[in-house]
């Protein structure tokens, strides 16, 4: 039996669509994080995030070049999600290619390393794979789709695996 799970995954490519030299977010050596957004015509810009300090909010200040900037207080090691609120319109960071989907919302993400967040990093270990398969359901007399996680090495031996069903 295979380990079965219905899951949502988002792959992340390290693609560079940063605008010139603008870097956001910038995780600093003191575990603060600096956000930047080029919005020369904006009247107000906030960062809305899931860290605890300041209720997860920060107000960016506008620079002469139209780039808004905010640096957080020191953050714990973790994976954080955030979005920008520009004059009441909320969206992801346009120069950060790393995102996470949560049901109907998409968030930009970043990691503050040196602790818990290190567990999110890709490790040099054998990785399994997720396959999308179709099956016929006699109960509803229709074809259904599911995602199946297969551990590394699955199918190469007669080893039996436990089954885990996640329905949501």
Where are these regions (language model features)?
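Short beta-strand elements bearing conserved aromatic residues within extracellular beta-rich modules
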Residues: 45-47, 82, 146
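Aromatic-rich carbohydrate-binding modules that target alpha-glucans
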Residues: 36-77, 87-113, 150
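Bacterial Sec-dependent N-terminal signal peptides
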Residues: 1-13
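The feature marks proteins involved in alpha-glucan
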Residues: 12-28, 74-140
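Structural beta-strand segments of beta-rich domains
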Residues: 31-35
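Short beta-strand element of the alpha/beta-hydrolase
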Residues: 146-168
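Low-complexity, Gly/Pro
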Residues: 8-11, 41, 52, 62-64, ...
